[in-house]
């Protein structure tokens, strides 16, 4: 018999899972239909579609972990499962990073030759960013496969340990390398890009307020809306990364509140940010409304 708080947690996990599948599925379907109609896909749509596919698989794994936690199902821990998990997790992180870079290059206004070069070529660089991410993540997986006996399973064992003590192993150098390669590099790139974008949008908003103070101008709220969207992206991305670091370095009892809270927050990012992307994209928002209206009519 499940305890009441576990039942509530599982219901929240199911809602989170369905929301993540729906929001990311909308992105994939809408962009897929556009690809079939026009025989081509815009760079941003390509990046969003790849990110949405990776998040669907990530959401599936998070829900699988929730089922394991709630119902005490035995987790089959083998090299293949660990490699797939690592690949999906790292690829999603890098694609989200490149999305932040893309927004920064397209929207931010920075007077620097390197930034001007990036702004002019970012659309052409998107396929190479995706390909580079695939190759980089594959190299990380190959590195982990050489240490499959203790490295990747060691990461997963932290999810299912009965103690709360910090892990201490003779693999400190490998752990530091893994942290830098898997978390620090994409996080630093993302932070630089998003902070530049936030400062640029903030400066633009102040200029608009000074220029048109006391008057109503169409589109005046657009920079503020974009700024709030980017800030929410930053908060979700950063909290997602930090919680992954905590789960990688500490042991938790699987049914304690802090562990359940961490797993729930990890799942909020791939579903919550995709919802923000849909609400901020007129094409995706319109198609999502059409889908919901069609679903109501069919009932």
Curated annotation (Swiss-Prot):
Gene: TAS2R1
Topology of this chain in the membrane: Multi-pass membrane protein
Annotated S-S bridges: none
Molecular-function GO terms, alphabetical: bitter taste receptor activity; G protein-coupled receptor activity
Topological region Extracellular: 1-9, 77-81, 146-178, 244-257
Function: Receptor that may play a role in the perception of bitterness and is gustducin-linked. May play a role in sensing the chemical composition of the gastrointestinal content. The activity of this receptor may stimulate alpha gustducin, mediate PLC-beta-2 activation and lead to the gating of TRPM5.
The protein's name: Taste receptor type 2 member 1
UniProt xrefs under Pfam families: TAS2R
Key words, A-Z: G-protein coupled receptor, Glycoprotein, Membrane, Receptor, Sensory transduction, Taste, Transducer, Transmembrane, Transmembrane helix
SUPFAM superfamilies the record matches: Family A G protein-coupled receptor-like
UniProt-annotated glycosylation sites, renumbered to this chain: 163
